[in-house]
Curated annotation (Swiss-Prot):
Pfam families: ThiF (PF00899). GO terms for cellular component: cytoplasm; cytosol. Pathway: Cofactor biosynthesis; molybdopterin biosynthesis. ATP binds at residues 34, 55, 62-66, 81, 125-126. It catalyses: [molybdopterin-synthase sulfur-carrier protein]-C-terminal Gly-Gly + ATP + H(+) = [molybdopterin-synthase sulfur-carrier protein]-C-terminal Gly-Gly-AMP + diphosphate. Catalyzes the adenylation by ATP of the carboxyl group of the C-terminal glycine of sulfur carrier protein MoaD. Homodimer. Forms a stable heterotetrameric complex of 2 MoeB and 2 MoaD during adenylation of MoaD. This is Molybdopterin-synthase adenylyltransferase. Binds 1 zinc ion per subunit.
């Protein structure tokens, strides 16, 4: 181990003891897009013993510009991101354990994963999942690192339950969000800077150096050469529904878990269906073949229908590309599959 990590061990803030702690650590990465792949690669090379990745999507050609683990072969095969990431990370470091889950991040799927993790890295692309992470991290007392980037801008904040403001506190005071990678684009340097900060914060936490973390909200614009750190200690709220004295964890409630959602900027609707989940895969393929050519791998099915492109995952989710109307997406699935 010493030869592989020799340069890292020479960094006195880590050393041999810190390297051993990393080997015994477990990091959960929620999302395997640009931030998720950068963070997963960096932490795997650093020797974090167990890395768990959860992601609901598959590799597309537009991902290759900034999502560093993936290859053209992954895009051609429409490989689920979590599985492709696991394969590439295992080739980078065979000494560590990689777990991959091809499913949506919901309260049900995320809670058992967060309970096992020492640190959670936020690499999601939507507000709802971030707030789920926030509530679950508060509930399980798990530290996590928020991160987001779009265009040439990026931001991050480390959240330690019981010590720092949570994301719900922050969003009450600081407007965050708006544009997305799909609407405003993104350049890789913005991704790499946010991910580098997230990795550094994770290494500090995993090696027991909580005193070294960034105590604030950091935002920057790599194109316009701006960088700002905001002191957010004052935004922590005693009455916060997520981290206050009488927390109720609002984003863990069923009413905050929609069965269908428009994916921002992608002209795509995701539909979750228990009925779809119960149909045997071979039966589903048989039905779809009456409509057109079915492409399949171990994790998903793909078919074109009229002006729509439909991708069906093993966990009962379907992506209907070509619409941003939930009713239309449900209607398409009803015609194609009979739901």
């Amino acid at each position: 181990m010493e030869e592989r990590y020799s340069r890292q061990i020479r960094f006195k803030q880590i050393g041999e003891e810190g390297q051993k702690r990393l080997a015994d650590s477990h990091v959960l990465i929620v999302g395997a897009g640009a931030l998720g792949t950068a963070g997963a690669e960096g932490l795997s090379r650093a020797g974090v013993g167990t890395i768990t990745i959860i992601d609901r999507d598959y590799v597309e050609w537009s991902n290759l510009q900034r999502q560093q683990l993936y290859t053209e072969s992954d895009a051609k095969l429409r490989m689920p991101k979590a599985m492709a990431a696991k394969e590439h990370l295992s080739a980078i470091n065979s000494e560590i354990h990689i777990e991959a889950y091809v499913t949506e991040g919901t309260a049900e799927t995320l809670e058992p994963l967060i309970e096992k993790a020492d640190v959670v890295i936020d690499a999601t692309d939507n507000f709802e999942t971030r707030m789920l992470i926030n509530d679950l991290a508060q509930k399980t007392k798990t530290p996590w690192v928020y991160g987001a980037c779009v265009s040439s801008q990026g931001m991050f904040m480390t959240v330690i339950p019981g010590e720092t403001p949570c994301l719900s506190c922050l969003f009450e005071q600081i407007p965050v969000g708006g544009a997305t990678c799909d609407t405003a684009g993104i350049i890789p340097p913005a991704v790499h800077i946010v991910s580098a900060y997230q990795q550094a914060e994770a290494l500090k936490l995993l090696t027991g150096q909580k005193e070294a973390i960034q105590r604030g909200f950091v935002t920057f614009d790599v194109w316009n050469n701006s960088h700002m750190k905001i002191n957010v200690n004052h935004v922590r709220r005693e009455e916060c529904p997520s981290c206050g004295a009488n927390a109720v964890y609002p984003y863990l409630q069923d009413w905050n878990t929609p069965k269908a959602a428009v994916l921002c900027g992608r002209d795509t609707v995701q539909v979750r269906s228990e009925s779809l989940k119960r149909i045997p895969k071979q039966e589903l393929i048989k039905r779809l073949k009456t409509i057109g050519k079915v492409e399949a791998n171990a994790f998903l099915l793909h078919i074109f229908y009229e002006d729509f492109r439909i991708v069906i995952f093993n966990d009962g989710r379907a992506l209907v590309h070509g619409t941003n109307d939930v009713k239309e997406a449900n209607s398409v699935l009803a015609r194609v599959i009979g739901l």
